[in-house]
Amino acid sequence: EGGGMYTPGGRGGKVIVVTSLEDSGPGTFREACETGGARTIVFNVSGIIHLKSPISVRAPYVTIAGQTAPGDGICITGNSFLIDTHDVVIRHMRFRRGAQDVAFRDDAVGGNAVGNIIVDHCSASWGLDENMSIYRHVYNRDESGHGLKLPTVNITIQNSVFSEALDTYN
C-alpha cells in the first residue's frame, strides 16, 4: 500500500544469500547491500550483525527479505543503515544504532533516498539523531554554496515501530 506500492525492489534480479554475521567479507549483509544490479537479499543465518561503519545501499532495485532468516531473525546494530538510491523494499528487519561512537550523531535508518521505497514490518531504535529519516539532498555547487533539499517521493512505511531514541534531537 501507499506511495511505494509499485516499486519492484529486486524482483527479477539475482538472489544473494547472507551466510555470515560478520561486518564485512564474503557472504555478509554489507557485501549483499553494496553489490550492484537488481537483487533480493535472503538470510540463512540469524542473529546480530554489528556494523563497524555505516552500510549505504547505493545501487537500486533491491529487496531485503529479513523474514527469510531462521530463528529470531536479523538485527543490525552499531552503526547506521542508509538508503541512498531508489526502488528498495525492506521487510522484517531490526535496526539498533546504539551509542558506540557518540561523535557521529546519526540515524538508525536514514539516507538520501530518491523514492520508491517500502519499509515493512521493521523496527528501529537507539538512533542518535533520529531513529529513521529519509530525505533527499542535492548539492548545488553554485556560487551560493548552499545545497538544495528536494522531495523524496513514493515512500511507504507500514507495520513498523520506531522507538527509544537516545538523544534530545529525536
Describe the function of each predicted region:
Residues 29-37, 48-65, 72-91, 97-115:
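Extracellular beta-strand-rich solenoid/capping regions of secreted or surface-exposed proteins
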Residues 13-15, 104-106, 129:
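Short, solvent-exposed beta-strand edge segments and adjacent coil->beta transition regions
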Residues 19-23, 43-46, 54, 67:
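Acidic/polar N-terminal loop/beta-strand segments that form early-domain functional surfaces
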Residues 20, 73-76, 165, 169-170:
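Blade-edge beta-strand/turn elements of extracellular beta-propeller
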Residues 47, 136-138:
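Active-site-proximal loop/turn and secondary-structure-junction residues that shape catalytic pockets
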Residues 61, 66, 70, 86-97, ...:
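Right-handed parallel beta-helix
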Residues 80, 108, 131, 168-170:
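Structural detector of coil-to-beta-strand junctions
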Residues 1-41:
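Acidic Gly/Asp/Thr-rich repetitive segments characteristic of extracellular carbohydrate-active
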